C-alpha cells in the first residue's frame, strides 16, 4: 500500500482504515491531490471550512498541516471515514483539537466560509448534501468539489445549480477536475425519505438518501429473505444492516430474539431505527431493549456482553470506489469471535466472491444453503472457541474453487429453503 502523500510541498503518511488492507489500495486519490493543489495555487487562507466526504482524512490532514489551527468541521456518513481521519491525524502528529465532527444528518453550523467536497457515487445523497448546505451557506460562499473527470458532466453541474448555486468545472489534471460552485443564498428543503412496502412480509421500509437499494429490495436481500435460518435464536446481529430488512424479518420469525443492527453508514443505522419503530416489532412481555443500533466499523466496538447465536450478513465488496474483500474478511472473523459456541453465521454474496473459502478458513466448515446463477447463501457454525481462526487471504488456486452444493454441517440443520 502506498502511504507517502506528496503534493504542492505537503508531505504526509496516509493509510486507509483499517490499515491491514490490500497493498494496492491507498488512502487518497488524484481528486484529493487536485483539490489541495488548487487551494495552494489560489493561496487560500485559513477560514472556517467544512470538509465533506473526506474518505480517510487526506483533505483534513492537509489543511491541518498547512495551518495547525485551521478551523474545520468534518462531515461523513461512514464510521470508517471518521476513524480514518482520526488515525491519519495522529500518524502525522496533527491535532484534532477544535475539529467539529458531524454525521450526515446533524445540523451544519452557520458560520461556514468555505466548503471542500469529494463527489460521492450516490447522486441522490449528493443532492441531499447540497440541500443541507443551501440551508446555512450565505450567498457567495465558495464550494469546491473534486472528482474524476469522467464523473463530471452537464447533468452533475445542473444538479449542483438546482440545489445550491451556479457551478463550473476546471481543466482536467491527472484525469480529475475541480468544480467551483458559488452559493446563491436560496434555502432548499430536504428531499422526502423514500418509503415502500414489502407486502408479503407485511413490512414498511424507509430509506434515507445514502442507503443501498433506495426503493426496492436488492437481489441479495431477496434471496436471503427466502432462505432464512431456522432455530431457537435469542440474540441476532444484522451485520451490514442497511435499512434493516433482514433484522426486521428475523424479529418476525423469532419474536423472542433481541436484534442488534450494525452498519458503517450512519444513515443506514437511522433507517433501521426508523423502520423498527415504523413496523412496531417489539414483543409484548419481553424484558429490556429488544433492538440496538450500532454505527460501527463491523463489530469492532460492540460490547463484549453481546454473544449472538445468529449473525445475518450481506457483506459489501466496495469501500467508496475501491473494490475490496477486506470488509468480508473482517465481518467473518469478528462474527466468529462474537458468536456463542455453536452459533451460526448466515451469509449471502455473489458467487464469484468465493466467500466459501474464507468461511472454511475461519470456521473450519461451510455449507451451501441455496444458490442461483449469481448469488449463493452460505452458512458456517462456530464449533470451537479455543483457537483464533486462520486469517490470511486464499491462494490463487483456492480462489478458483467452485461453490458446490453440500449437506448441512452435522451439528446444524438450522436453515430452511423456499418451499
Curated annotation (Swiss-Prot):
Reactions the enzyme catalyzes: guanosine(1835) in 23S rRNA + S-adenosyl-L-methionine = N(2)-methylguanosine(1835) in 23S rRNA + S-adenosyl-L-homocysteine + H(+)
CDD domains found in the cross-reference section: AdoMet_MTases
Protein localization: Cytoplasm
A Pfam family that the UniProt record links to this protein: MTS
Family listed: Belongs to the methyltransferase superfamily. RlmG family.
Name of the protein in question: Ribosomal RNA large subunit methyltransferase G
Polar residues composition-biased segments: 409-419
Source species, domain of life: Bacteria
Function: Specifically methylates the guanine in position 1835 (m2G1835) of 23S rRNA.
Listed Basic and acidic residues bias regions: 386-408
Keyword field: Cytoplasm, Methyltransferase, rRNA processing, S-adenosyl-L-methionine, Transferase
Gene Ontology CC terms: cytoplasm
EC number: 2.1.1.174
Entries under InterPro entries matching the protein: DNA_methylase_N6_adenine_CS, rRNA_m2G-MeTrfase_RlmG, RsmC/RlmG, SAM-dependent_MTases_sf, Small_mtfrase_dom
Major localisation: cytoplasm
UniProt xrefs under HAMAP family: 23SrRNA_methyltr_G
GO molecular function ontology, one term from the record: nucleic acid binding
Region spans: Disordered: 386-419
Amino acid at each position: 500500500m502506498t502511504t507517502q502523500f506528496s503534493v504542492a510541498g505537503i508531505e504526509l503518511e496516509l493509510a486507509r482504515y483499517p490499515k491491514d488492507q490490500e497493498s494496492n489500495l491507498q488512502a487518497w486519490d488524484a481528486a484529493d491531490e487536485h483539490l489541495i493543489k488548487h487551494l495552494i495555487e489560489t493561496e487560500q487562507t485559513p477560514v472556517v471550512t467544512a470538509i465533506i466526504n473526506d474518505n480517510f482524512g487526506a483533505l483534513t490532514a492537509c489543511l491541518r498541516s498547512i495551518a495547525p489551527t485551521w478551523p474545520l468541521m468534518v462531515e461523513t456518513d461512514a464510521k470508517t471515514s471518521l476513524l480514518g481521519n482520526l488515525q491519519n491525524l495522529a500518524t502525522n502528529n496533527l491535532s484534532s483539537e477544535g475539529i467539529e465532527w458531524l454525521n450526515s444528518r446533524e445540523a451544519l453550523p452557520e458560520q461556514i466560509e468555505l466548503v471542500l467536497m469529494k463527489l460521492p457515487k450516490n447522486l441522490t445523497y449528493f443532492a441531499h448534501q447540497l440541500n443541507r448546505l443551501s440551508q446555512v451557506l450565505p450567498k457567495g460562499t465558495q464550494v469546491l468539489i473534486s472528482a474524476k473527470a469522467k464523473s463530471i458532466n452537464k447533468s452533475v453541474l445542473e444538479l449542483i445549480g438546482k440545489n445550491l448555486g451556479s457551478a463550473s468545472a476546471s481543466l482536467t489534471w491527472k484525469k480529475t477536475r475541480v468544480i467551483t460552485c458559488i452559493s446563491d443564498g436560496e434555502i432548499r428543503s430536504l428531499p422526502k425519505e423514500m418509503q415502500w412496502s414489502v407486502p408479503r412480509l407485511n413490512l414498511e421500509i424507509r430509506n434515507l438518501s445514502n442507503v443501498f437499494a433506495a426503493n426496492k429490495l436488492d437481489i441479495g436481500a431477496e434471496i436471503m429473505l427466502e432462505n432464512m435460518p431456522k432455530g431457537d435464536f435469542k440474540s441476532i446481529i444484522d451485520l451490514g444492516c442497511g435499512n434493516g430488512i433482514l433484522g426486521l424479518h428475523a424479529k418476525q420469525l423469532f419474536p423472542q430474539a433481541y436484534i442488534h443492527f450494525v452498519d458503517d453508514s450512519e444513515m443506514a443505522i437511522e433507517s433501521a431505527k426508523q423502520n423498527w419503530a415504523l413496523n412496531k416489532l417489539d414483543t409484548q412481555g419481553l424484558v429490556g431493549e429488544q433492538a440496538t443500533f450500532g454505527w460501527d466499523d463491523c463489530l469492532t466496538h460492540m460490547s463484549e456482553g453481546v454473544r449472538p447465536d445468529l449473525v445475518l450478513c450481506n457483506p459489501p465488496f466496495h469501500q467508496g470506489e475501491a473494490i475490496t474483500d477486506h470488509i468480508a474478511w473482517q465481518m467473518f472473523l469478528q462474527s466468529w469471535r462474537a458468536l456463542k459456541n455453536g452459533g451460526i453465521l448466515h451469509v449471502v454474496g455473489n458467487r464469484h466472491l468465493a466467500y466459501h473459502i474464507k468461511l472454511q478458513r475461519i470456521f473450519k466448515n461451510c455449507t451451501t444453503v441455496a444458490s442461483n446463477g449469481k448469488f449463493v447463501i452460505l452458512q458456517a457454525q462456530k464449533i470451537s472457541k479455543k483457537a483464533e481462526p486462520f486469517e490470511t487471504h486464499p491462494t490463487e488456486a483456492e480462489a478458483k474453487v467452485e461453490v458446490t452444493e453440500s449437506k448441512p454441517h452435522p451439528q446444524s440443520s438450522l436453515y430452511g429453503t423456499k418451499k
